[in-house]
Structure formats: structure tokens, C-alpha cells
A protein has these predicted regions:
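Sec-dependent N-terminal signal peptides
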Residues: 4-15
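Boundary of Sec targeting at the N-terminus
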Residues: 19-20, 33
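A short beta-strand-turn-helix
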Residues: 25-45
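Short pre-active-site segment immediately N-terminal to redox-active cysteine/selenocysteine motifs
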Residues: 43-46, 51-54, 124
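Hydrophobic beta-strand anchors of alpha/beta hydrolase catalytic cores
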Residues: 47-48, 80, 128
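Structural microenvironment flanking redox-active thiols in thiol-disulfide oxidoreductases
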Residues: 59-101, 113-118
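Short, internal strand/loop/helix patches
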Residues: 97-131
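Thiol-/selenol-based redox modules, centered on thioredoxin-like
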Residues: 130-160
């Protein structure tokens, strides 16, 4: 009976995760303008990565994606959105880091109040989502292991 209940729970959770869309939550962009996360949806699939300046695996993941991004962009039209969850006291460090790391091809957003983090049920960083061109969340993953960025790219390619 417990196995059956677990299976039913897993199926329900699987179906609900596939039907989720990006919430209508406001964040700041690189210029300090307040925008909705939905405004980044433009028909192209994207990787959304939640990170912070104190999270070494976050920075490793974003750098690994950045190293591969030129090759990936030759194969598929996609984008990367880096969402800093640094608070108002440390967001200036996050802004400086996004520029210093050379993440020029990223859309960098700042979730100072962690409203988007809460709305997307992010508890740990790094937390990465794959979102299709319509704003539907199709994949979610916590943590980073070197090489796992290739799995993200495979999932992006599968959306085309």
C-alpha cells in the first residue's frame, strides 16, 4: 500500500511539475530596472540559474555554462538567465561579479527580496531550471557536479 501511495504521489508531482509556468514576480535587471521574470520569455528556451556570491558551486556552474555557451549558441537559439539571490546588503557584490566573470551573454537578474526564489520553491543554490519558449518549466535541478551542464544543454536541444 505504501508503494502504491508513493507511486501515486510521484505521478501527481511529475504532472504538476510539467505544467508549471514562470510566476509573475518582479526582480531587478542589470540596469536596476524592476521587471517581471516573465518579460525574459521571448520564444527561446532558457536556462535559469539561481546563485549567490557566497556559493562556490553556483559560480562553477555558471562559469562552466559560460565556457560552453558560444558552441551551444551555434547549435540552438537559447539564453541563460542568472538570478542572484543576494540580499540588499550584498547585491552590489553580485552586480560586480556578473561583470567581472564575463557573463556578458547572460541576462542577469537580482532577486534582493527573494520573492522569485520563494515563488519557484528554491531552497538551495545552485538551483537550475529549464524553461521552454512559452515560459513553461520543464526541468528543475538542485546542486552542481562538474559536467552536469552538458545535461542541461541536452535538455535544451530536446526542446527544439
Amino acid at each position: 500500500m505504501k508503494k502504491l501511495m508513493f507511486l501515486m504521489f510521484a505521478l501527481v508531482m511529475g504532472f504538476s511539475a510539467s505544467a508549471q509556468t514562470l510566476p509573475d514576480v518582479k526582480v531587478e535587471n542589470q540596469e536596476g530596472k524592476v521587471v517581471s521574470i516573465r518579460e525574459v520569455v521571448d520564444g527561446t528556451p532558457m536556462i535559469i540559474s539561481f546563485w549567490s556570491t557566497t556559493c562556490k558551486p553556483c559560480i562553477m556552474e555558471l562559469n562552466a555554462i559560460n565556457n560552453n555557451l558560444p558552441d551551444w549558441l551555434e547549435e540552438v537559439d537559447m539564453k541563460v538567465v542568472a538570478v542572484s539571490v543576494d540580499d540588499a546588503r550584498t547585491v552590489s557584490r553580485a552586480r560586480a561579479m556578473t561583470q567581472g566573470q564575463g557573463w556578458d551573454d547572460y541576462t542577469c537578474l537580482y532577486d534582493k527580496n527573494q520573492d522569485l526564489k520563494r515563488a519557484m520553491n528554491v531552497s538551495l543554490t545552485p538551483h537550475t531550471f529549464i524553461v521552454d519558449g512559452s515560459g513553461n518549466i520543464v526541468y528543475s535541478h538542485s546542486g552542481y557536479t562538474p559536467g552536469s551542464e552538458e545535461e542541461l544543454f541536452e535538455k535544451i536541444k530536446a526542446l527544439k
